[in-house]
């Protein structure tokens, strides 16, 4: 069962190991169990390839905590995410359970332009995929080719902007393996509004008491986040999604 306090303890321990190798300004925690790192300026210092540096940190985490890891290496943040989410999941783990996958713009196009479903890709939800499929666009390769269509053709970038507005720009970039956002930009971002959130996916139905415990632990963690960010609030929103089949048990 989810144990938020234990997850946080291990997340903190693992993050402290990363800090032995990488400065905090070059690390962006994406979730409790996932981070982005910009290691560009560290490769020469350590005289390592990106894969060697990733493996060194993963082995340190494994030795210290007993937890193995999967890593995605890319020439930008998007390709790192895709390398981990899609490519690494389809390669054989080593004896320690470690999977490391690498992508650059060209290998992304070779390996993943025909990959389906589109919802496997970062930031492509079911709504996006459905709209694209209605126009016969089923892959990232289809989207990329559509983006360079001529003005008098049905398939061109105007179609994508018609479907998604300004969001089409990022979709087109991702179709080609580009990502305009850098680590520096992410770290410098200041939201107009402040909020914190937390989520858990339960792998089996929970009774009331177990579910209440999970919600309490998540709330406690968000309170700590608020304190850390020097924020106060008078509102909390709880959203519960469920598989309707579980109601039949």
Region spans (language model):
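Gly/Gly-Pro- and Ser/Thr-rich, intrinsically disordered tail segments characteristic of DNA damage-repair
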Residues: 1-179, 183
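DNA-contacting surface of Y-family translesion DNA polymerases
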Residues: 120, 128-249
